[in-house]
């Protein structure tokens, strides 16, 4: 199954294990005011709880749009990192979809598992799928979600060409 090879089910833990502690992160933008972001984070917290994680804190930042490198600004990322280190947090869940580069950059900075809303929802479906057909459909959805992220991961090799002279 996909979860065995690609660790797509990052919240899954043994039954007796402590639930993972997570922080939720969202952006207040010109398109989304504070009240709307609070509503989205309430929903995200419910999803995290459904997946088996406990929300320890929420972080928001008011910006014009997501940072292409790390979704949030460097100062906010540092604030989140300090909180994670001080409070035994194992996961950060972002309200919006993240690119593969953003996930890699954020993981490097925060040193915890990074999920976005879509990967969290797919995780919930994977945990609850019972029939072989349902499991296959969830696995297909996970692959479809991963495909563009995996494709963009190798763009750093585009200029390297083989050939003579």
Regions found by a protein language model. Give the residues of each.
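N-terminal accessory targeting/assembly segments
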Residues: 1-123
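Extended, highly charged alpha-helical segments
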Residues: 120-165
């Amino acid at each position: 199954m996909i979860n065995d090879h690609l660790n797509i089910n990052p919240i899954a833990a043994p039954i007796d294990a402590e639930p993972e502690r997570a922080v939720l992160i969202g952006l207040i933008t010109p398109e989304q005011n504070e009240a709307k972001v609070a509503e989205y984070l309430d929903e995200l917290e419910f999803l995290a709880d459904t997946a088996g994680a406990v929300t320890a804190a929420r972080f928001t930042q008011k910006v014009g749009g997501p940072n292409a490198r790390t979704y949030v600004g460097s100062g906010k990322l540092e604030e989140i990192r300090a909180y994670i280190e001080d409070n035994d947090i194992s996961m950060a869940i972002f309200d919006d979809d993240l690119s593969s580069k953003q996930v890699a950059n954020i993981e490097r900075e925060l040193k915890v598992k990074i999920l976005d809303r879509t990967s969290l929802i797919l995780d919930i479906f994977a945990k609850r799928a019972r029939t072989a057909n349902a499991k296959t459909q969830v696995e297909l959805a996970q692959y479809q979600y991963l495909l563009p992220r995996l494709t963009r991961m190798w763009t750093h090799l585009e200029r390297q060409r083989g050939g003579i002279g």
